[in-house]
Amino acid sequence: MTTFTHINSQGEANMVDVSAKAETVREARAEAIVTMSKETLSMIVEGKHHKGDVFATARIAGIQAAKRTWELIPLCHPLLLSKVEVNLEPLLETNQVRIQSLCKLTGKTGVEMEALTAASVAALTIYDMCKAVQKDIVIEHVRLLEKSGGKSGHFIAEEK
């Protein structure tokens, strides 16, 4: 059975020692879905939101969040990310925005939390910028899509 890596033999939370691990190329992709009204999505897509470019702001927020994950999530290592990408895709038929993030580095620990944080904060930024026009926006399906590198190998999430 696999054990929790952040719990020591006394049952206490601690930061994992990665000093003996080999550096490998590591990559992770994550996504979040933001559901809103047709009117709110149209306002964003048509560039008519009074706060400015919602997608550009959410993209930058997601990138910044990935870089600061270690400050937000206890026990995460500070990482020297080599790439962070955040893409936002309006899904007009379902009144949703699909956010997908990619994080990459060559290092001793994975970038799953950075990718998940990027997608999550981009989604939260959309909510923040749009809450004045719609309070019941829903953020859902935040999940890891894929990870590679490291001893646990390659993971690809099942399609939803």
UniProtKB/Swiss-Prot annotation:
Keyword set includes Lyase: yes
The record's keywords, sorted A to Z, are: Lyase, Molybdenum cofactor biosynthesis
Task: Please indicate which superkingdom the organism of origin belongs to.
Answer: Bacteria
Q: What are the positions of the active site?
A: 128
Q: Which top-level enzyme class is recorded in the Swiss-Prot or TrEMBL entry? A: lyase
Q: Which GO terms describe its molecular function?
A: cyclic pyranopterin monophosphate synthase activity
Q: What is its EC number?
A: 4.6.1.17
Sequence positions that bind substrate:
75-77, 113-114
Its pathway, per UniProt, is: Cofactor biosynthesis; molybdopterin biosynthesis
Q: Does the keyword 4Fe-4S apply?
A: no
- Which SUPFAM superfamilies does this UniProt record tie to the protein? Molybdenum cofactor biosynthesis protein C, MoaC
A GO biological-process term: Mo-molybdopterin cofactor biosynthetic process
Q: Which reaction does it catalyse?
A: (8S)-3',8-cyclo-7,8-dihydroguanosine 5'-triphosphate = cyclic pyranopterin phosphate + diphosphate
Purpose of the protein: Catalyzes the conversion of (8S)-3',8-cyclo-7,8-dihydroguanosine 5'-triphosphate to cyclic pyranopterin monophosphate (cPMP).
Q: Which family does it belong to?
A: Belongs to the MoaC family.
Subunit text? Homohexamer; trimer of dimers.
> What is the recorded name of this protein?
Cyclic pyranopterin monophosphate synthase
